[in-house]
Amino acid sequence: MPQQLLITLPTEASTWVKLQHPKKAVEGAPLWEDVTKMFEGEALLSQDAEDVKTQRESLEDEVTPGLPTAESQELLTFKDISIDFTQEEWGQLAPAHQNLYREVMLENYSNLVSVGYQLSKPSVISQLEKGEEPWMAEKEGPGDPSSDLKSKIETIESTAKSTISQERLYHGIMMESFMRDDIIYSTLRKVSTYDDVLERHQETCMRDVRQAILTHKKRVQETNKFGENIIVHSNVIIEQRHHKYDTPTKRNTYKLDLINHPTSYIRTKTYECNICEKIFKQPIHLTEHMRIHTGEKPFRCKECGRAFSQSASLSTHQRIHTGEKPFECEECGKAFRHRSSLNQHHRTHTGEKPYVCDKCQKAFSQNISLVQHLRTHSGEKPFTCNECGKTFRQIRHLSEHIRIHTGEKPYACTACCKTFSHRAYLTHHQRIHTGERPYKCKECGKAFRQRIHLSNHKTVHTGVKAYECNRCGKAYRHDSSFKKHQRHHTGEKPYECNECGKAFSYNSSLSRHHEIHRRNAFRNKV
């Protein structure tokens, strides 16, 4: 009769009876009276909040069905990863596998104990701690001993790669605690009419959770074998749901459906920048990002004093001082300080030019080359000389121009010691000593030291006169000839004599004028 009565009850009532009054589950009349009272709306708890607290404590002391005890914890964690060997199998293991087995088993057991699992010490752990051989007695049964041993060795190796972490075990304990509190709270909700008691219980549960997390963080703070300080941070976030019921009485439930959906309330914690709202998965990445906003540069080069916001940037910079070039081209052996420079260099071998100008379809191997090229279409010259106001498309052209004002000539010829303000000028000059003429005309075979000279020469074969005067229509093959012609119209005389101050339109005219002064000086001496 009692069992049949339990079957006819609603699921919630049947579960509550088995949990709350196991003795009454076998009694007919008392059971039916209690259940009838509960569903007619009478309060099963006529005591005050202290009675409810006492009942909660008694429920916590009971072994709730479906929740792991110390024994089940051992079965679900340690015994699942434990591997048993017979005496024969243990003897066949290589010393390296025996040592690996000892390390894995002892580490997993230590992690279980450190996060608070209450379990008796397995015999295999005692044997390993004493230095004894941890083999078990022979087990009768079918199977190939050699294949069984092979699978055990593979299990040891895979387990060594993924030993049970303290944080993972702690999350399991927290889930069990949440499920237990969930059942306790659900029971109180069903049998109590005191809403304020329920709310206080909910606050107590959340306070217990917060305290458990703080305790866990303190527990796992330790010093590893390398002397580094390790703090394991829990990434489990507990969500609190508020369900509204149709009844006039307000009911707030602290519900975690971890039994049916164990991962639905677990999400990875993220870190958001409160300035630009960018999100990061690791706190160290957020810290590095914040230096963009603060301008902080804590990493300083000891050689030159230059500061950087990231340690990686400092390491890359230091290669300038050490001369280290770790990235080497497999094609030609050329080495680079940066991987990006090597990637750009590879395009010289592959011929790849992924950056294309939208206006003229000219392609470039580097993005910076495309940016500089686009300024020829837009006319932009963003780099201005502070001395004379002249503007340039590229910063290197401005740097070279500034040397005109400073008189700096940092490039010296090793053959004749002549100095130059531009590296290109030195390169061109050195061809005088070497006799190199790398630019050859395909039409007549004539060779030139500079590319501009070859370009000017080609107009002899093509007959093209690309430079035409807007005032008189006269055309010229060379840009230099065109500029000289324009001085006829403008009256410009940039070449001035240092002795008499007379100015000339052409440099050749100034040279002829200097001859007059030299002849006059010679006559005066005679």
Curated annotation (Swiss-Prot):
Transmembrane segments: none
Domain KRAB residues, every copy: 76-147
SMART domains given in the database record: KRAB, ZnF_C2H2
Induction description: Up-regulated in both visceral and subcutaneous adipose tissue of diabetic individuals.
Primary location group: nucleus
Keywords linked to the UniProt accession: DNA-binding, Lipid metabolism, Metal-binding, Nucleus, Repeat, Transcription, Transcription regulation, Zinc, Zinc-finger
UniProt note on tissues of expression: Expressed in visceral and subcutaneous adipose tissue.
InterPro entries: KRAB (IPR001909), KRAB_dom_sf (IPR036051), Znf_C2H2_sf (IPR036236), Znf_C2H2_type (IPR013087)
One of the record's GO cellular component terms: nucleus
One Gene Ontology molecular-function label: zinc ion binding
Zinc finger intervals, C2H2-type: 271-293, 299-321, 327-349, 355-377, 383-405, 411-433, 439-461, 467-489, 495-517
SCAN box domain boundaries: 1-39
Record's subcellular location: Nucleus
GO terms for biological process, alphabetical: lipid metabolic process; regulation of lipid metabolic process; regulation of transcription by RNA polymerase II
Family: Belongs to the krueppel C2H2-type zinc-finger protein family.
Role description: Putative transcription factor that appears to regulate lipid metabolism.
Protein name from the UniProt record: Zinc finger protein 69 homolog
Native source organism of the sequence: Homo sapiens
